[in-house]
């Protein structure tokens, strides 16, 4: 459901809330110190926090276009299940963002990677159980 919402630009970013005329004190990204509106592209690709997270996965990309960035990530991962990794990693970034906004827990690239590993291990276990 998460990635379906992301692909259709329906994930509850601050930009989407602004477009839906919801008033917030700020529409800037909560995960970085830049005064940049929190868009999907920013949150998952160009945000300094997101880039630090991707770096923990040994993925570096310079593209800001989402489709070209996906191609760069695919090339660097060299795995047939690269989309599973991308989806789970975006989910981990999203959860870090939500923990900060709703619980006041500062985002951490290390915790993002740790959460990704836990989620990925669960995916592997479910796949083996079938």
Predicted regions and their residues:
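Helix/loop segments that flank and initiate small ligand/metal-binding modules
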Residues: 1-37
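Short cysteine/histidine-rich zinc-coordinating motifs and their immediately flanking basic loops
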Residues: 40-46, 58-62, 106-107
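K/E-rich alpha-helical interaction surfaces of small helical-bundle regulatory domains
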Residues: 90-104
